[in-house]
Amino acid sequence: VKRCCDEEECSSACWPCCWG
């Protein structure tokens, strides 16, 4: 399963996925 944010770079669009 490919995650939205699997790297240290976390764009605002990816926040819900990163911090969700």
From Swiss-Prot:
Tissue expression profile of the protein: Expressed by the venom duct.
Family to which this protein belongs: Belongs to the conotoxin M superfamily.
Propeptide, residue positions: 1-3
Transmembrane segments: none
Name of the protein in its database record: Conotoxin PnMLKM-D0211
Annotated localization: Secreted
Keywords assigned: Amidation, Cleavage on pair of basic residues, Disulfide bond, Hydroxylation, Neurotoxin, Secreted, Toxin
The keyword Secreted is assigned to this record: yes
Listed GO CC annotations: extracellular region
GO molecular function: toxin activity
Main location: secreted
Annotated domain remarks: The cysteine framework is III (CC-C-C-CC).
Taxonomic source organism: Conus pennaceus (Feathered cone)
Tryptophan amide, modified sites: W19
